[in-house]
């Protein structure tokens, strides 16, 4: 039976730009760019897991604002259910505690990065919601 993981990802937005993080060399899909986040642990809600992961990976205290979209993909023999959430408010300065580097860019610029495949549909959903004028 294939292992299934629930994973959360943050589309962190500030001043019209979103934060991308480059995966470290020791991780799956090394060097690809992604939205920061991680696995949902037993007993956690998705927003709780995201707050914890952003504290661990970036050193920020985030306020999870709104659900964006989900995507399912097989990665390294595991079925990943990836759920994106919008984060527009946080305290602290994001730092690359886990990732190689961080980069702020517009959502359109993000499409030019070598993104982790599972994150592309989430970015497209975010861009579509912005184009539809959904509230910020």
Language-model region placement:
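C-terminal structural segments of small proteins and small subunits
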Residues: 107-121
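Active-site-adjacent beta-strand/loop module that shapes the phosphate/pyrophosphate-binding cleft
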Residues: 61-63, 70-94, 103, 107, ...
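Conserved N-terminal beta-strand and adjoining loop/helix that marks the start
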Residues: 1-19, 39, 70
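HhH-family (HhH-GPD) DNA N-glycosylase catalytic core used in base-excision repair
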Residues: 55, 61, 129-131
């Amino acid at each position: 039976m294939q292992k299934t993981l629930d994973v959360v990802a943050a589309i962190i937005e500030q001043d019209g730009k979103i934060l991308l993080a480059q995966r470290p060399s020791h991780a799956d899909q090394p060097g690809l760019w992604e939205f920061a986040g991680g696995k949902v642990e037993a007993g956690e809600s998705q927003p709780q897991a995201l707050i914890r992961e952003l504290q661990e990976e970036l050193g920020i205290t985030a306020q999870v604002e709104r659900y964006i979209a989900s995507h399912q993909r097989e990665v390294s023999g595991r079925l990943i259910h990836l759920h994106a959430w919008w984060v527009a408010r946080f305290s602290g300065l994001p730092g690359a505690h886990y990732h190689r580097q961080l980069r702020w860019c517009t959502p359109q610029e993000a499409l030019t990065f070598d993104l982790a495949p599972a994150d592309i549909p989430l970015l497209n959903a975010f861009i579509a919601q912005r184009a539809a004028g959904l509230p910020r």
